[in-house]
A protein has these predicted regions:
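Active-site glycine- and acidic-residue-rich loops that bind
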Residues: 168
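Radical SAM [4Fe-4S] cluster-binding motif and immediate context
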Residues: 1-164
Length: 168
């Protein structure tokens, strides 16, 4: 287990892959490299992930789970089931990486119920033109603002990823 602020936590991966093609990200390179080797996005079953978390908690006394998945909210049905199981079967806190343009009220409610603290999402830059042009992120300022409002509405803390030192 790792420690953050004196609290033990563990890193988990519930999924691998990402369908987006952001120019700066390595994940789509893996997808291209392994194109004929199976699915580009693979999800573990929600119950299996929760079972692994419970066993790690039993063995190491963790208090928090940090998911390293690129985009935890890619599959809404999966996320809803996982959050329900996590909330029912653990008393832990979780941290996830999400994409702002695929957030909605229902997903936010599920994350809040599952004690998500914090959620993380990438803005990359305040310039929408640079974000969507150079970085090929395809994410509008309005989508970012709407997601921030959802976090505030459900009182879920969030952290943003930002790049520094880009051209212009």
């Amino acid at each position: 287990a790792y420690f953050s602020g004196g609290k033990p936590y563990e890193l988990f991966e519930a999924s691998r892959g990402c369908p987006f093609d952001c120019s700066f990200c390595f994940i789509h390179q893996f997808r291209d490299m392994y194109r004929r080797k199976g699915k580009g996005l693979r999800l573990r079953t929600p119950q299996l992930v929760v079972d692994d978390i419970k066993e790690t908690h039993r063995q190491h006394g963790i208090k928090q789970v940090m998911f390293v998945d690129s985009t935890f909210n890619l599959n809404k049905k999966w996320l809803m089931e996982f959050c329900e199981l996590f909330a029912e079967q653990t008393d832990l806190i979780m941290t996830v990486n999400i994409r702002a343009d695929i957030m909605d009220d229902e997903i936010m409610q599920a994350l809040a119920k599952a004690r998500c603290n914090p959620a993380r999402f990438a803005i990359e830059t305040g310039s929408e033109e640079m974000r969507n042009g150079i970085l090929e992120k395809q994410l509008t300022n309005e989508q970012i603002q709407n997601t921030a409002r959802l976090f505030k509405k459900y009182n879920v803390p969030f952290v943003t990823y930002n790049m520094m030192g880009m051209p212009n």
